[in-house]
């Protein structure tokens, strides 16, 4: 397996992920107006799950705007994992 081919596929995987995720987040934007608190009973209660979702949204938006070449190695590894699956599928194809 060529390292250049793997990196080219990894870059493409990132572009595909970014395109889909950007679209999905735009569609879901009306329901993703997350605060840190949620209504519970007669008051507002801190919800750590909402905080985690908010942090994930920030990370995803940053990753969407970041070209593959500028991602961290850990982030690139996620795209490389999918590129490797494509390479295996291509090698197995008749």
For each predicted feature, which ranges?
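Alpha-helical propensity feature that highlights long, continuous alpha-helices across diverse contexts
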Residues: 1-94
């Amino acid at each position: 397996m060529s390292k250049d081919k793997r990196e080219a596929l990894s870059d493409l995987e990132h572009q595909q992920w970014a395109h889909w995720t950007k679209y999905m987040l735009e569609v879901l934007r009306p329901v993703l107006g997350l605060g840190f608190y949620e209504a519970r009973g007669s008051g507002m209660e801190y919800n750590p799950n909402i905080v985690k979702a908010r942090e994930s949204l920030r990370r995803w938006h940053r990753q969407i705007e970041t070209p593959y070449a500028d991602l961290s190695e850990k982030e690139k590894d996620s795209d490389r994992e999918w590129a490797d699956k494509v390479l295996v599928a291509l090698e197995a194809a008749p």
